[in-house]
Swiss-Prot record:
The active site is at 76 (proton donor), 227 (proton acceptor). The keyword Cytoplasm applies. It comes from Burkholderia pseudomallei (strain 668). GO terms for cellular component: cytosol. Belongs to the diaminopimelate epimerase family. This is Diaminopimelate epimerase. Coiled coil: none annotated. The keyword Protein biosynthesis does not apply.
Amino acid sequence: MKLSFTKMHGAGNDFVVLDGYTRALPPLTGAQVRALADRHFGIGADQLLLVEKPTVDGADFKYRIFNCDGGEVEHCGNGARCFVKFVRDHGLTGKASVRVEVKHGVITLTMQDNGEVVVDMGAPVFEPARVPFDASGLDGRREGADTLWPLPVNGVTRWISVVSMGNPHAVQIVDDAEAFAVRVDGPAIERDPRFPQRVNAGFMQVVSRHEVNLRVYERGAGETLACGTGACAAVAAGIRRGRLDSPVTVHTHGGTLTISWNGARDERAPLMMAGPATTVFEGVIELPA
């Protein structure tokens, strides 16, 4: 079967986007997702995005996200920005703002006149059981309004914030994000048994109260050039710890995101993420068996 696709990226976090809205697509297996995402024998991507018709009232579209390891995940901020550019560029909507069904709910995406996309990422969740994170038997320590949890990582105790942005995140503050051994500690944190669904590991360097450098080792994808939900989780943790003030400029290897959150006043407030979305190319590929 021939499969039309669009290759896109948001701040270097790259995606294969498939249109299941205007055409019927067969259910994709994990092996097929891995083959399409393979950078040597397929198209190459951190994740695959599938555009579908919504199944809930009040949503314009539904989108599903698959990591390059073939597993389906809950949310992707950079993918959400690419999603709204895709549906507008392909004439699926003329709206500047669309409501999109994702695995954990409905989010609102808005295309700005300057081409950037603003995503209402929803409110962060800090309760360990809802992340989910097993904090049983651990003695946390308070910093600001946050609780930091000790996690043994390669023989060293790391103090982490746990945050859900619809997907689980473990955030730690480091002195130098560029020099930190992200690809050593990242896999150990991702698969720590206290995270039953595994976790995205964020390593944040605070540059000023409005600026950070961030690297994220993503669950099922490894280190990526940018992670939208990771940026939101890091900023939320930093504000809650009293280290940051909104808005925050987040520098990643792939580009810059702007995160705003009024959480110092109301932790139920949604995080707003602004950043670019870029189409790289379009093509046709034979769907692997």
